Amino acid sequence: MYKRQPDIGIITNIGVSHIEYLGSRDGILKAKLEILEGMKKGAPLILNGDNDKLVTVREPDYKLVFFGIENPNVDFRAKDIEEKNGFTSFTVEFYGASQRVTVPTVGIHNVYDALAAFAVGYEMRMEPQKIAAGLKSFVPSGMRQRIKKVGGITVIEDCYNASPDSQKAALDVLSSFKSNRRIAVLGDMLELGKYSDVSHENVGKYTENKNIDILFTYGAKAKHIAEGAKGFVDEIKSFDDKTELAKALLETLKDGDAVLFKASRGMKLEDVINSLYRAVSYTHLR
């Protein structure tokens, strides 16, 4: 029993995270829709209208609100997306109106999240300008795509957790950096069950045309990322030991490089990041 009833529900994505326990993406959708059990009848349920599973949701007892980029029939749509100097700007079109929004982060996945937040604010009867101001003041929390400068190196901390979709999104972010070299440090993605090997390999294949110069993988499952990336990344190394990984990374990094760290929470890839920080002084990028 829910002691409190949420006023608004949000489901941002149906991917393959936790598929080991839920069996299929349909099983994941069913589990996420359990949020309705605690919501008041008629409350807004905000859904990603670009997701093939969420766009099929029909819940007549609730107010369905869709957001997206590709789907022209959503209620909140992002258009004219621009990335520059670590910021992303876009126009939100909604119910015949529009509002320009800027968020201090990059990556199309962050546009989706900002759209969901904008929709929440609107449902709470906030002024669009105030919603935009709030989004502009957003600060990423620890290990969730937080960007730092380590000497002359750009570090993208994004290892709070990982799924196939978020790994690919993180590679998109790394690819967007105008750096001397782009280095990806990718670890195991957990809870993928029978889809694990192919999911890791597909992440590796996703490096095609992403201009990733060096790929380091950590963990037994992530070796399949290395396999998938063959032919797309010039230098690939796999590690089972964090100390060896950290040592190799420190020997490889040069001023002007950008390095991404991404893995599931259980891999504790922040241990490698902390080894890097102990080796060199760092300041915030902004």
What are the functions of these language-model segments?
Residues 1-5, 283-286:
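Conserved small/polar residues in nucleotide/adenosyl-binding loops
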Residues 6-155, 179-180, 205-208, 212-214, ...:
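Acidic, Mg2+-coordinating active-site environments of NTP-dependent enzymes
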Residues 246-252:
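Short amphipathic alpha-helix with an adjacent loop that forms part of the alpha/beta core around
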